[in-house]
Amino acid sequence: MRRFLVATLAVLGSQLSLAGAAAEAQAEQTDFSITNTNVSAVWNQTEWSLTTVDYVPAQYQSRISLSNGYVGASLAAAGPFFEYDLNQTNPDGDEPANVWPLFSRRLSFTTISGFYNIQQNGSGTNYPWLEQYGYESFIAGIPHATGIIFTFGDASLDSTVDPSEVSNFESSLTFKTGVATWAYTWSPAGVSTTFKVSFKAIFSRVHPNLIAVEAQITPSADVKGKVTDVLDGRSAVRSYLADKGLDDESTTIFSAVHPDNLPNITAYVVSTAKFDDKYTDKSSRVEASAPIVSTNGTTIGQTFDIALKSGQTATFHKYVGVASTDKFEDAEAVARKASKDGTSAGWNAAVSEHVAAWGELMTEAAIDNFTDPATGHLPPDADIEILQIATVANSFYLLQSLQPDGSGLNDNSLSVGGLASESYAGMIFWDADYWMAPGLNLNFPSYSKQISNFRVKQYEQAKKNAAFNNYPAESVLYPWTAGRYGNCTGTGPCVDYEYHLNHDIAFNLVQIYNITQNKTWFDDGPRQIIESIAHMTGNLLDYNETTKTYWIHNMTDPDEYANHIDNGAFTIASSADLLFVVNELRRNNGEAINETWKEMSENIEFPTAASDITLEYQTMDNNVNVKQADVILLAYPLDYDQNNYTASDKLLDLDYYSNRQSPNGPAMTYSISAIVANTFSPSGCAAYTFTLNGFLPYLRAPFYQFSEQNDDNVKRNGHQNPAFPFLTGHGGANTITPFGFLGLRTDRPNLFINPSLPPQIPHLKLRDIYFAGAGLHITMNRTHTTITRFSTEGVPALTDKYAGKSMPIEVGTPGDNQATFTIDVGQTVYVPNRLYFENITYNGNILQCKHVSSTDAYAPGQFPQAAIDGAIATAWQPTSNGSSSILIDLSQGGSFEKVSKLYFNWGSRPPRRATVSFGNETASDCHGQRQLNGKVVRVPVTVKPNDPFDAAEAAAAVVKPYVGNETLVSVPGEAWSGKWVKLEIEGCWANGDGDEKGATVAEFVVVGDGN
């Protein structure tokens, strides 16, 4: 059953209720999936805010992530406090851990951009022997700066407040303003007074060194207590104390830390308390001590006596300045000035300018919009409402981790979890260049340039890496992971691993140049990097005298389940494309091309099976299990078309590898599947199924942050500790509308689109995008795409290539351009969409892409829609092998047909039993679930596997296209389609050895008698 209230969502004013009442306390870790009602999330479409009424402490998914691109923090469920995760099943058991390579305790992290330490190794690594050549560089924390703690008697209000003491809870994050809030009633045990409390926090979008917090408290009776401004050192992991103290004759405290093993680098955190004089005894100020604050050596706090009055609200503010010597020579002075200036300006001024700055970024024009342009309302569809919320959240979470170009603070790229997370040790992976940058490049190139600037900054080190590994002069090798230096390390090898990172970097540099046309920037670093990567690639490719082709040996493709293989398809195809691109750049600049690179590009060893399936690597068998998107990346973003790699080959690969995808892979994979399906599918609507799979299983309530895994429970997800928040997932999802639905490509000199909007989505207004320095407003409906060009004069870092003249727009399938439109500034053109989804995959099928529902729980990403989307690349799978069903609605148009046959593709897990029912009426049962009613015609189906899986056979067999288990049933008698069709399945032929998972249905087809 799809247990989330958006399925029966009611629009009340501007609010969409996405979940019901607070879930009861659970023995296990709470399931924060948005497809549950365990944790509430209420969306306000006008304010772009999410609000929860459920207080779920000590679990990372419930924390708000806030940052401003320079400093960021994860804030506790109870308020802007530091918080540890706790073991929800056994208080004495193992502490919840973060992901590789640290496997450290989950906590509310806070740091400064680029504040990396050095240390010999981590708890996890890739190549331990590389540790002898250079230390690791992991993100280091700073003291958690946002806490204001109230104490009455022995009771203190911090992140550990017991849920039994909290009522009327409400916490929200507003994406338009970047303001986080908490409000509730606190009834501390042993204290006769109750308190209405609220907190607000901002990380200033205007002043990158400033954090501001407001706390308000209203007692039910006169009461005396204490208030503490704390800088909590427990988040300063991998850092050590430089200095700390309380300033004399003021209300300022500070804590300064060095990242481990770097005494020449110092971060300063300076907090000034501006507490309500009416209720605060300033003369009582003392240094805070346990148990109010932690005993961590970098913790510092200041405590004041307070006397509150019944029913009167007391207000307390703190203004925190943060700076490190990485970017500010006199970091202490910068931090102190930020704190002082914030205090002088006051809360209202700080919030006002912060909100205005976010308002300039999070505009209606900057966000994809699924509302009906005639009514301004979202369609009454739960999934589209989720897509709308997530689209807003994607942009916010990515942008809040970035500073704009020209700030002097934008050269540390974007880590997997951003500035509020230590997941993956805060290191930089291909995630930034390949997954986060493309969507941001389109409408926020000034911000996305931070990703490119990082690679430019570490260019010299990349040249040293290549020289160390005996590559010729002018070559570069970027390490798989990078921190402060970009050297080759145990976690970040430069050779014998994922060479494709270098190509990913180059392709992003080319694409941001194509978008901005900022040639001054491009020729001052990026162009040289791309050339150097070509030199490296030319040395990496090894000529095979037997095959007369170029090979890559001992490497890893994006699928990290397969290491030390030859000729990874994505890497070797990327090598060929990179060499081609570099020669094109040379040709366009009037330079001689490199003939050797041309010959290499045209003669790579492209691993292909006799069945035309692209092999992920040279020796792959039919038993492959893929971690994440790999071969399908050839279709997009690579748009590879050499070696006679056709559109039909790309579709064949999509079907094959979709059925080889591990359920434990990371979140971004299905964004690629959605784009590829919408580009190359000749029929059906699998692109929409993949789109849902790119969002729904990975989004977490209450604040729509991505998790790396579709199931956060390590006992069920292959023992994977998910990265959180997973900005890579946000980045991938942020590409689906422009690159999938619009079919945009930015890897070529002219704007290229191939529009097709899935039939489930009636309207889409895309974010405004830039290309070749020009600006474009774009809207889509079912049949057409409308494009209006606007002037970009005055937009920083953009040079309109077509200023004063018409701009060409190529429309068609990549590699097969079909039409060219031209557009002037202020002009509108109308481009017909591809309506391929109107084509029926199985001739005569009356169910394809109709509305389908189910009241039964399904496996993550295995949606009921998959059973009728016209593709075997997707499948519906109930969570259990008990009786489960789907109900297809045929009542909306069309005439009834006599049914002649039924066809099923069960995928890899056929059920034991199946029944198809036809009827014209439905009614709710005692559980409120819709069931067929009245006259019902039932057709029992005998199911026997005809393509059973055998691991030994698969390992020995040649690689062949995916088919699945099939059943064809002729329907005798007078069975008519009716208004409703129901498929019930039970059992699973694959069950055994404790496997109680449900069967799969890849395609369910009903064929009318007229076909």
Positions of predicted regions on the chain:
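Fungal secretory targeting signals
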Residues: 1-24
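Non-catalytic C-terminal accessory modules of carbohydrate-active enzymes
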Residues: 130-190, 196, 684-866
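The feature captures the catalytic groove of carbohydrate-active enzymes
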Residues: 418-428, 474-528, 535-599, 785
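Acidic/polar, glycine-enriched structural segments that form the non-catalytic walls/loops
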Residues: 20-424, 815-817, 825, 829-849, ...
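Alpha-helical scaffold segments in carbohydrate-active enzymes
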Residues: 392-400, 454-461, 528-540, 581, ...
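Active-site core of glycosidic bond-cleaving carbohydrate-active enzymes
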Residues: 428-458, 502-507, 511-515, 524, ...
